[in-house]
Amino acid sequence: MALSPLRKESEMTIDSHLSIAQRVQAKTRSTKRTYLMIKRMMDLVGAACGILLLSPLLLVITLLIKLENPKAPVFFYQTRVGINEKTFRMYKFRSMVPNAEDLLKDLLHKNEIEGAMFKMKHDPRITPVGRFIRRTSIDELPQLWNVVRGDMSLVGPRPPLPREVAEYSSYDKLRLRVKPGCTGLWQVSGRNELSFKEMVELDLEYIEKRNVFFDLQIIAKTARAMVGSDDAY
């Protein structure tokens, strides 16, 4: 199945929003149990194999982060919102200075993306090692543990922060009807080059179309994007 082009924002009307909302709601209600079982099996096998095969890389990154700042933690965790608005603790390699959250309030006016997200290409809170692991998406690898725990799936919408969800419309919240993922249609379609509205549309498109083969296609495209990617920050 080919990844379809993004729905243009100019084409999105109230009627089309209602139509998409109805289709997403119907899709999440009618999703076959067989698909969900296969998806969970893929998640467990994929995450376990990923942790095992990538363990040397995980060790190297751990050492680099520790050498950069011996007193700071290697891992960073944050409360995120998952399926049906249930919160969970999401893990990442720390890519910012330890007091990054305290510094955020002074940077909010420099947000480079519209909507309920914060993105800044030259964020001063990012460390030198952090810049590399963000560019290659290596900072996301600890989320494989979230997949094993069942908080996340390998493929699904990006898990938002509670403060982001507080700004969501009822339409935006449709993306919370499925389990969030380590990667998804948004991530392989432009990621930080896309607006918040475009991210929502891509997530809803994924929910409408999701199946085993579509998931595998997104995983394959993610693996290719991790090598030489320059749109992650």
Language-model-detected regions and their locations in the chain:
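Short, glycine-rich, amphipathic interfacial segments at transmembrane boundaries or analogous
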Residues: 13-18, 75-124, 183-201
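A short, structured surface patch at a secondary-structure boundary
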Residues: 116-178, 218-226
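Cytosol-/stroma-facing membrane-proximal "stalk/adaptor" domains immediately downstream
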Residues: 165-189, 193-218, 230-231
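N-terminal hydrophobic signal-anchor/signal peptide
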Residues: 1-52, 173, 206-208, 230-233
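An acidic site on a long C-lobe helix of protein kinase domains
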Residues: 37-41, 53, 125, 137-140, ...
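A hydrophobic, helix-centered structural microdomain
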Residues: 30-100, 218-233
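Residue-level signal for cytosolic alpha-helical hairpin/rod architecture
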Residues: 45, 126-129, 201
